[in-house]
Amino acid sequence: MDAFIATFTSPGPELFQLGPFALRWYGLLIAIAVLIGLNLSSSLARKRGLEQGLISDLLPILVLTAVVGARIYYVAFEWRNYSGDNFWSSINIFGLAIPIPSAMEIWGGGIAIHGALLSGTLAVLIFCRWRRQAFWDVLDVLVPSIALGQAIGRWGNFFNNEAFGVPIKGDLAWKLFIPFVNRPLNYANNEFFHPTFLYESIWNLLVFTLLIVLFQRSNKGLLKLPAGALSCIYLITYSLGRVWIEALRTDPLCLGALPPSCEGGLRIAQLMSLAMMAVGGFGLWWLYGRKRKLPDPGRPKSFA
């Protein structure tokens, strides 16, 4: 009997095509995640007593900034694939080929969540200073939606046949089939790989569940959760999972080396995750060890 009980095979990146326009699964999943996140974070914001309509005002800015930041971050570390002869590409609109920089072809894949987190956090900070809102309170109602959005968005990697793990060795109860054209050259003869998209999706669902449980207990007065604590917990828990999952991937962003092994170099996502864990750990120590509030960059006077 076949030892495998679950085989994942992508139907392809496109849901359907209408003329020159195609609806991609990745885009649809991101849209779904944004809508769910809007409703969830708006509900949490009401429970936190934040200004009505704050999240709906912030969301368009946050999404745009996060997507642009995710793309810039990815292109910066993969510049060899977007420079020189690869700099220009084209987009076909009603039979007319329009030249564009290849770095703008975000629909072809190539975004990095750490870039989205960095640029998104900056957007929240600027927004809070503009609206004179408490930065940590706003961030705390966003992080559960971010974790859930990551869980949903990871399935976009499945449809795109990207961000998969190393070939499966031995018997496992699951496997991911990758078409020949999407396999790294050194794994061209391997058909089945670790479904790292699934690992991270499940991990992010667990992080989301933890954050919601903590938020609800805090809201009921059963747990002391100072402003910023939930954000710090997200940084630690998400990064814990990302560190070990990243070690399995065949397409990591590398520093001083090339994928899939990054031999002789470093995996950027692991470095960023370790840094996020350190920041989150320091934040919790500040809140619970020193029993002090986190300085609020959204309200400059709080530094006085």
Curated annotation (Swiss-Prot):
An annotated GO cellular component: plasma membrane
Compartments where located: Cell inner membrane
Known EC number: 2.5.1.145
Binding positions (a 1,2-diacyl-sn-glycero-3-phospho-(1'-sn-glycerol)): 154
Molecular function via GO: phosphatidylglycerol-prolipoprotein diacylglyceryl transferase activity
HAMAP family: Lgt
Family membership: Belongs to the Lgt family.
Keyword set, alphabetical order: Cell inner membrane, Cell membrane, Membrane, Transferase, Transmembrane, Transmembrane helix
Membrane-spanning parts: 18-38, 58-78, 106-126, 133-153, 195-215, 221-241, 268-288
Pathway where this protein functions: Protein modification; lipoprotein biosynthesis (diacylglyceryl transfer)
Top-rank lineage group of the source organism: Bacteria
Membrane topology classification: Multi-pass membrane protein
PROSITE patterns assigned to the protein according to its UniProt record, in alphabetical order: LGT
Organism per entry: Prochlorococcus marinus (strain MIT 9303)
InterPro entries in alphabetical order: Lgt (IPR001640)
Described function: Catalyzes the transfer of the diacylglyceryl group from phosphatidylglycerol to the sulfhydryl group of the N-terminal cysteine of a prolipoprotein, the first step in the formation of mature lipoproteins.
Name of the featured protein: Phosphatidylglycerol--prolipoprotein diacylglyceryl transferase
GO BP terms: lipoprotein biosynthetic process
Pfam annotation, one family: LGT
Primary localization class, coarse: membrane
NCBIfam families according to UniProt: lgt
